[in-house]
Amino acid sequence: MTLVPYVVEDTGRGERAMDIYSRLLKDRIVMIGQEITEPLANTVIAQLLFLMSEDPTKDIQIFINSPGGYITAGLAIYDTIRFLGCDVNTYCIGQAASMGALLLSAGTKGKRYALPHSRMMIHQPSGGIIGTSADIQLQAAEILTLKKHLSNILAECTGQPVEKIIEDSERDFFMGAEEAIAYGLIDKVVSSAKETKDKNIVS
């Protein structure tokens, strides 16, 4: 069971308790800190849409510490990021692997960050294939289609040729923070909030 801390604020009308994620949302901060599943994606998407409705011009910050997860769930978050009218600042803290790396790279160019000891990883999609021979063929075709989509997205986000993305993704391809800059996955390594362009997290 995941423990969620609560914070207490003085509202002027008394004290109000809220979970830490709701408090962060007030500062337009969204956290992806686990495997990317459909329920998580729906929660993140709802948060992003809420923040867009609150102010469609103000930056949103997404902090990522995720081993990856389901492709369709990750793509749903990716499409929502692209749908927003505001800039989205992405941060890797810990790890951004697989779909986590794709979402990290999807931030607004110039505003994609990683902390010094972060690790990033890209690889090709995989899945257990069972069923009849016809089912196996259909599922294999779907995996190839998803592989093409993911490679094209990463190529667009990083500036790397699609062929290089495909080649590098054949196996788990790990990068440190500085290597991720060279690859085009992020724009800057930061060790302090003051080093970012994000006014919402710098007091």
Swiss-Prot record:
One of its GO terms (molecular function) is ATP-dependent peptidase activity. The keyword Lipid metabolism does not apply. GO terms for cellular component: cytoplasm; endopeptidase Clp complex. It holds the Pfam family CLP_protease. PROSITE patterns: CLP_PROTEASE_HIS, CLP_PROTEASE_SER. Its EC number is 3.4.21.92. InterPro entries: ClpP (IPR001907), ClpP/crotonase-like_dom_sf (IPR029045), ClpP/TepA (IPR023562), ClpP_His_AS (IPR033135), ClpP_Ser_AS (IPR018215). Keywords: Cytoplasm, Hydrolase, Protease, Serine protease. Belongs to the peptidase S14 family. NCBIfam families: PRK00277.1, PRK12553.1. This is ATP-dependent Clp protease proteolytic subunit 2. It comes from Chlamydia muridarum (strain MoPn / Nigg). The lineage of its organism: Bacteria, Pseudomonadati, Chlamydiota, Chlamydiia, Chlamydiales.
